[in-house]
Amino acid sequence: MPKRKSPENTEGKDGTKLTKQEPTRRSARLSAKPVPPKPESKPRKTSAKKEPGTKISRGAKGKKEEKQEAGEEGTAPSANGDTKVEEAQRTESIEKEGE
């Protein structure tokens, strides 16, 4: 992109074109106003640090993990998405035992 040419340097092949003036800085009226103070932000609450060995039940996330673990045991649907009758019966019996 070509640089702006100063109005003093209007000689040459682009001498007939007028160049834009540099934009002026803030007007005196705006610079006279004081900047409004920023509102203080509330300090964030810090959570209590837990020991690394303790486990916390996470609700829905925990259920997903249980399903993944069950899938590793061989009760998950087969690769193409179809379930076998034996696998369906196993999952039903596991769900009944859990209740």
Curated annotation (Swiss-Prot):
Keywords: Chromatin regulator, DNA-binding, Nucleus, Phosphoprotein. Disruption phenotype: Mice are viable and fertile. Mice have a mild diabetic phenotype and lower plasma glucagon levels. The overall shape of the islets, the location of the alpha cells in the mantle of the pancreatic islets or proliferation of pancreatic alpha cells are not affected. It comes from the Eukaryota. GO terms for biological process: chromatin organization; positive regulation of transcription by RNA polymerase II; regulation of insulin secretion involved in cellular response to glucose stimulus; regulation of transcription by RNA polymerase II; transcription by RNA polymerase II. InterPro entries: HMGN_fam. The modification Phosphoserine is found at S6, S78, S93. The modification Phosphothreonine is found at T10. Residues 1-99 are annotated as: Disordered. Pfam families: HMG14_17. GO terms for cellular component: chromatin; nucleoplasm; nucleus. Expressed in the brain, eye, prostate, thyroid, kidney, testis, glial cells and insulin-producing cells of the Langerhans pancreatic islets. In the brain, expressed in the lateral olfactory tract, anterior commissure, corpus callosum, internal capsule, fornix, stria medullans, optic tract, axon bundles, Purkinje cell layer and granular layer of the cerebellum. In retina, expressed in the nuclei of cells in the inner nuclear layer including amacrine, bipolar and horizontal neurons and in the nuclei of ganglion neurons. Detected at low levels in the liver. It is found in: Nucleus. GO terms for molecular function: chromatin binding; nucleosomal DNA binding. Residues 1-25, 39-53, 83-99 have a biased composition (Basic and acidic residues). Interacts with the ligand binding domain of the thyroid receptor (TR) (in vitro). Requires the presence of thyroid hormone for its interaction. Interacts with transcriptional regulator SEHBP. Interacts with nucleosomes. Binds to nucleosomes, regulating chromatin structure and consequently, chromatin-dependent processes such as transcription, DNA replication and DNA repair. Affects both insulin and glucagon levels and modulates the expression of pancreatic genes involved in insulin secretion. Regulates the expression of the glucose transporter SLC2A2 by binding specifically to its promoter region and recruiting PDX1 and additional transcription factors. Belongs to the HMGN family. This is High mobility group nucleosome-binding domain-containing protein 3. It comes from Mus musculus. The lineage of its organism: Eukaryota, Metazoa, Chordata, Craniata, Vertebrata. The gene is Hmgn3.
